[in-house]
Structure formats: C-alpha cells, structure tokens
Amino acid sequence: AGNIPFTDSFIKRVHMLSRLPVSEINTLLGQVGLFSDISAFIAAHREHCVIATGNLDCWVEKLLSRINVESHTSSARVEDDHIAKITNILQKEDVVKMYKALGDKVVFIGEGNNDMEAMRLADISIASALVHPPATSVLSITDYLVFEEGTLCRLLNQLC
C-alpha cells in the first residue's frame, strides 16, 4: 500500500471493478460488519459526526444508510448498472477545510495515504489501526494512534 498515488490507484481499482454490477458491489458493502461501539458513538453524536470516504457513492450507499450520518464520497456516472465514468474523486482535505471555514473544530480519523493532508489540516488527528496498520505517512503527523475500538471511543468522548 502507498506505492502509487491514491488517485492513480483509485482509478485503477474502479476500472477493475467496473466489470461488476454496481448493485452487487453496493449490496456486498452494505453487509460489511461495523464496529458496534463506534456505531453507537456515531448514533449518540450524529450531529457532530461526518464520514468522508473516497469510495464511490453508488458503491457505499447501503453501507452509509446503515450508519445514517452525513457523508462525503467520490461519485460516478452509472449506466446499465455499471460505472461509466468517475465524475468526482473526493479530496478529504476539502471536507476538513469546509468545516473549519464554518468555525467547527475538526477531529479526523484516518489510516491511509489519502488521509494524510486532511489529518494535517484537522485540529486533532487520530490514526486508526483497527483494521490494518496505518500508512507510515500519517504516523508522522498524527496526534494520536489507536489500536482498539474501546480506546478510540474513550478518546473521542474525552475530546467531545
């Protein structure tokens, strides 16, 4: 991971997956397991939580509907249940800039190279190692590193 720029990698992944029906990917991702404590934290603090994912809106629609929180995604034009064209690749740092311009304090949780700039701009950044180790690039700029769901939730409660 991290050997090629995120945008190039993302375009290649979308191209590979474009052979599959969008509805099938959406259904499969809609069944992905969620961290129960994090889900409960989001539900209790819904007005202060936002998801920023580089994934395509048409792929993560069902997953995001389960979480039921404001979200920002990449987008694509879909034709005959297949990706016809990527129309926007989310730059997560733009989401951070938007909320900071509104006067909000931004706590950003990420783990990948594509999170680095957003984490750098956030008021507080948290590198997550809940699923896999964070990219080396984010370790140099993060304020906190968490390995367990309970630890992340305790930290978020302290920061709120």
Each language-model region and where it sits:
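A metal-dependent, Asp-based hydrolase signature
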Residues: A1-A44, E61
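C-terminal cap/substrate-recognition subdomain and adjoining C-terminal extension
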Residues: F35-C160
